[in-house]
């Protein structure tokens, strides 16, 4: 295909229609062939290269030669194939482009997918410690504990001991143990992945109220219902009268950032959206968004920041619960919330997906593989794969109860 043919093909199914289907829960996948010829697979790869170069917001963050080398290697490897399945094609592409770190960018079919993300997991031991000046002590034996720089301490809540910590490590590879010195002797501590709330049925909002505390749970922000946004605003407004508001965002992978923004507007009166957002503009992005072919030079435009001041109508304390299934626009909400006074975060690290976002859907012509392609850059200060770290790390499946117990002691 020529560049014009690529544009015309991409414009046939604009995001104005696909986004509506996705938000309504409709299936956006097409039937993929069982196998592809090497020629058809190579044609898909060349279309993918065109999309990367003209519509992927993360493309300019890497050296172009890396992409050129990777795509040349993919095409060369396909020449040795008589037939290849769509799933195999996905894996060949992802393995050659493994230098990319992007949790949104992905290639999928209806029953298979692969991407460009490897989470920095948190592993902790069962040994709680506390800190006195610059030294750490075992909370049970009271003996001093020494460890090297690879081992981290994670502030936690302990109603009986101040300045308490979990000890462990953050790693992209499974880690089963760490070595420490306790009372001058070497000791090996088993590690486990930090506990977090188990997945439950997704819902936009659930609310309950206990004396001076409001508990608001939002496990999904998918959709675009103005009525639902208004509901979140009214719930936020209702919460102003409470001394404590617990906002449980566990397992919320994101969706539409207007949902959390409406809750915060209701609670505080306004949200200072100071996160810098860069929108990629190009002929391909325009064609995919609108279905219109138009010559637009490749460039980034910064979205305007309005308003520039947070509201102050809530005078209580906001307690936000997060875990390693919090991502994308929900992480954006964490950055907004962190700009208010008297806000504390509990749980564990967020997923760290969202630096590149606002997804467009592209179909590779022959395989019908779906490319989920970010077209914006969100500079929220949350590093991809690292995530947002809480003020207090809670090794529990029920962080809400831990936080409520903590609040009751205030």
Region roles according to the model:
Residues 96, 318, 326-341:
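Cysteine-centered nucleophilic/redox motifs
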Residues 345-400:
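BRCT (BRCA1 C-terminal) domain core and associated BRCT-interaction motifs
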Residues 1-245, 249-253, 258, 262-265, ...:
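Flexible, low-complexity junctional segments that flank or bridge functional domains
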């Amino acid at each position: 295909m020529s560049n014009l043919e690529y544009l015309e093909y991409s414009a046939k199914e604009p995001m104005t229609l696909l986004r509506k289907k996705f938000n309504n829960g409709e299936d956006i996948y097409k039937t993929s062939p069982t196998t592809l010829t090497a020629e058809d697979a190579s044609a898909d790869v060349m279309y993918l290269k065109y999309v990367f170069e003209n519509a992927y917001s993360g493309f300019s963050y890497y050296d172009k030669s890396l992409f050129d080398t990777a795509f040349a290697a993919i095409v060369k490897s396909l020449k040795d194939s008589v037939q290849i399945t769509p799933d195999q094609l996905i894996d060949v592409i992802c393995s050659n482009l493994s230098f990319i770190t992007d949790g949104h960018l992905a290639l999928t079919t209806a029953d298979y997918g692969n991407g460009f993300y490897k989470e920095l997991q948190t592993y902790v031991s069962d040994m709680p410690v506390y800190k006195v000046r610059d030294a750490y002590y075992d909370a049970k034996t009271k003996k001093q504990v020494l460890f090297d720089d690879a081992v981290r301490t994670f502030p936690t809540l302990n109603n009986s001991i101040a300045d308490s910590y979990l000890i462990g490590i953050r790693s992209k590879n499974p880690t089963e143990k760490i070595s420490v010195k306790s009372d001058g002797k070497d000791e090996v501590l088993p590690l486990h992945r930090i506990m977090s709330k188990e997945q439950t049925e997704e819902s936009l909002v659930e609310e309950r109220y206990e004396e001076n505390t409001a508990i608001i749970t939002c496990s999904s922000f998918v959709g675009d219902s103005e009525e639902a946004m208004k509901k979140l605003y009214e719930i936020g407004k209702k919460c102003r009268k409470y001394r404590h508001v617990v906002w449980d965002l566990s397992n919320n992978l994101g969706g539409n950032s207007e949902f959390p923004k409406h809750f915060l507007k209701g609670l505080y009166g306004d949200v200072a959206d100071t996160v810098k957002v860069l929108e990629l503009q190009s002929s391909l992005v325009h064609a995919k968004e609108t279905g219109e072919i138009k010559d637009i030079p490749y460039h980034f435009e910064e979205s305007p920041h309005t308003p520039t001041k947070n509201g102050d109508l809530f005078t209580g304390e906001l307690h936000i619960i997060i875990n390693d299934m919090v991502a994308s626009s929900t992480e954006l909400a964490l950055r907004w919330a962190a700009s208010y006074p008297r806000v504390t975060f509990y749980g564990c690290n967020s997923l760290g997906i969202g630096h590149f976002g606002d997804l467009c859907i592209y179909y590779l012509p022959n395989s019908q593989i779906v490319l989920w392609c970010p077209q914006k850059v969100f500079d929220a200060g949350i590093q991809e794969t690292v995530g947002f770290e809480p003020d207090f790390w809670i090794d529990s499946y029920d962080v809400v109860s831990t936080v409520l117990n903590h609040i009751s002691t205030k």
